[in-house]
Curated annotation (Swiss-Prot):
Catalyzes the conversion of lactate to pyruvate. It catalyses: (S)-lactate + NAD(+) = pyruvate + NADH + H(+). The gene is ldh. This is L-lactate dehydrogenase. It comes from Clostridium botulinum (strain Loch Maree / Type A3). It holds the Pfam family Ldh_1_N.
Amino acid sequence: MIKKRNTTKISVIGAGSVGATTAYALMLSGVATEIVLVDVNKSKTEGEAMDLSHGADFVKPVNILSGDYKDTESSDIVVITAGAAQKVGETRLQLINKNINIFKSIIPEVVKYNKDAILLVVSNPVDVLSYVTYKLSGFPKERVIGSGTVLDTSRLKHEIGKRYKIDPRNVNTYIMGEHGDSEIATWSVTNIQNIKIDEYANKENLEYNDNFRKEVYENVKNAAYEVINRKGATFYAIALAVTRIVKAILGDEKTILPVSTLVENYYGIKDVYLGMPCIVGGSGIEKALSIDLNKTEASKLVKSAETLKNTLNNASGL
């Protein structure tokens, strides 16, 4: 549990597009009194901290610093965005060997100065790297969280909301499994303000069939690739997703978010990190929820877990 104190310190490891934008989103949210940026490119980190600090007049009081791992000491949350960026045509899982080696140098340094922090992994492939962080840190699973499928779930809500012309916040659903190509949409539990999606579509004379589900799912699954093809990287939406997770932790909200967590016995899945609805609060992940999936969804989730396990088993440097 994060201890109540007058200051809240968040460190962001990696000051690339995702890290810098995350720091910006955290600054706007007003959740932290201190934000520390750490990156191997110290000049860029200094520049990002300066640029952010120059906006201090427009937000709640917050101290933005650039520094090294020693400066992260006693952070409440350490957000890890460092790693090789995903290139055009490259899958998240193809990043693994590059980023495992990077994490082997980062995590021991983070742990050295932050014995009680919650670690929030954002770097891709996030599920695999969350597991790597869990193993390297020696922290309990509750305090090693991956950003998981929080963003993917938002993308799914956006797609449904756009097609049905409703506020996406009124769509209740989850993307589960890998944050990547094997992720699954949980159509069987999807509802619009507690009305099952098929019933809602029928009442409102809206499309809901195999073609609808396929199109929506493909758009969600391929969303990052489409953004990368157009602008080179994704960073705004993931920064907002990270900020949402951070707020849930710092506010001890006990809110349900599909973060990446260590799964130990769910449809036979165990010893792998993947996106699942979890109660997120001051202790980190307080409980993973075992929601009932239909047979098709459960089978796909098992395959998603197998994909992640195979990637870990085939990765070099572990």
